[in-house]
Amino acid sequence: MASRESIVTSISPDLTPLVEFSRQFLSGGKRFRALFCYWGWRSVCAPDSPLSPVVGAASALEIFHAAALVHDDIIDNSDTRRGAPSAHRLFDGLHARSGWAGDDTEFGRASAILLGDLMLGWSDELLDDALLEATDAAGARQARIEFNRMRTEVTAGQYLDILEERAWVTQPDSELLDRAHRVIVYKSAKYSVLAPLVIGAALAGATAEQLGSLREFGLPLGIAFQLRDDVLGVFGDAAVTGKPSGDDLREGKRTVLIALARDHGSAETRTLIDELLGNPDLTESQIVRLQSAIQASGAVDRVETLIADNVAEARRVLASAPLHADAVAELGALTDTVTRRSF
């Protein structure tokens, strides 16, 4: 950010908010993607491997993630992120305070789109710098391939997510659970866990067998990670999640949790979900009604079982993976961290 600030502000001091707001979005978060990238690298690297390539790759993932969150909040009309105003709200607040012409909201959304685009570019520049420092040229090429695939898949997954919020009415009920699971795989599981692991390992020159083990470990763990996030999106404490409780209900997320509630709940539960889910003006009492109906359907217990099954599969793969023992231990600890986050 320090190196890019001089480029941006040399164009005009009016661009200072782009840097300030970028810093704000990069200063928080749990750094899960960076951690998985680092431990993927550590799981296969030689003891004397230079650290700078993986630091650059992990940082590129964090900046990419920040950009994705900026765009995601625009898509979902989310007012907050990590307990603070989302990027488009920061910009529309700037517009309002400055007394400029036009609509605050329109300015905020347009500016945040550009901020996200800017950070996407910075992420790619940072990855390029990291790959140039890698000692294994073939591994660097593989890391770039994995990063490119991740960008395509997560964008596709994001489209599938917004599609499901609208297209579910035309789909057979029997297909909704599978469609919700597909969103999990591409919007989150591969992007949040599998890809960072493989990018880090590829950078260190991992063998095909090692990359295969990390994929087999990362996919079920990523699914469990997102299933936990879906539960938090409905029942989570705002102080823990940084988002208002029930935010996914207002946004109309057609998650595995919701699909299971519709499949196993009463007719009244299904009607309640279909009538209220996706209403941005849900009252607190309506959110409580939805939460109670979802809980009564048994969907939460079923999701908890899915989380446990996926974690068990990830641990099974990790136990016999051809990876360094210290990294295996840390990846095991991370497995607990990303799937046992509290309400």
Feature annotation, model-predicted:
Residues F36, S123, G157, I258, ...:
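Residue-level signal for inorganic ion chemistry
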